[in-house]
């Protein structure tokens, strides 16, 4: 399970270090795609297969389902770690997530998220203020 928050610097080539705690579970090759809230979602191959099966079950006759599937898969890229544990993020994904130099890599259970430091801070400030309210809404799912 992925958990924790790690700050890293992206180099000029668009490479970022994957935290050592995440490397083995992600595997040598993994999928990076557009996430929600302008972050990137990173899935190990086995988890990607699970997501892929669920998405394939969406009705293609539903306009929202078609839009989601198109954007989710069109933005996806298979990436791999180099020997130093870095991953080169494709330019279109860096642009989508507004990644510049300072990035935050967050473990979120079955996936990893990559955020720009600025967007992560903004997100946390807003979500932290509503944390208890969000928890109350989620209590049925948690228990």
From Swiss-Prot:
The keyword DNA-binding applies. Residues 5-47, 76-119 form the SpoVT-AbrB domain. One of its GO terms (biological process) is negative regulation of DNA-templated transcription initiation. It is found in: Cytoplasm, Nucleoid. Keywords: Cytoplasm, DNA-binding, Repeat, Transcription, Transcription regulation. CDD domains: MraZ_C, MraZ_N. It comes from the Bacteria. Its main location: cytoplasm. InterPro entries: MraZ, MraZ_C, MraZ_dom, MraZ_N, MraZ_sf, SpoVT-AbrB_dom, SpoVT-AbrB_sf. SUPFAM superfamilies: AbrB/MazE/MraZ-like (SSF89447). One of its GO terms (cellular component) is cytoplasm. The keyword Cytoplasm applies. One of its GO terms (molecular function) is DNA-binding transcription factor activity. Belongs to the MraZ family. HAMAP family: MraZ. Forms oligomers. NCBIfam families: division/cell wall cluster transcriptional repressor MraZ. This is Transcriptional regulator MraZ. It comes from Carboxydothermus hydrogenoformans (strain ATCC BAA-161 / DSM 6008 / Z-2901).
């Amino acid at each position: 399970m992925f958990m924790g928050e790690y700050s890293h610097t992206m180099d000029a080539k668009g490479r970022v270090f994957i935290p050592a705690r995440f490397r083995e579970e992600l595997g040598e090759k993994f999928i990076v795609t557009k996430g929600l809230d302008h972050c990137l979602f990173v899935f190990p191959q086995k988890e990607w297969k699970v997501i892929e099966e669920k998405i394939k079950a969406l009705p293609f006759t539903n306009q929202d389902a078609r839009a989601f599937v198109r954007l989710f898969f069109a933005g996806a890229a298979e990436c791999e770690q180099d020997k130093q544990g870095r991953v080169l993020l494709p330019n279109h994904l860096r642009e989508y997530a507004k990644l510049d130099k300072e990035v935050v890599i967050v473990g979120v259970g079955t996936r990893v998220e990559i955020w720009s430091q600025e967007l992560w801070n903004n997100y946390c400030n807003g979500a932290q203020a509503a944390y208890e309210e969000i928890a109350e809404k989620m209590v049925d799912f948690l228990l």
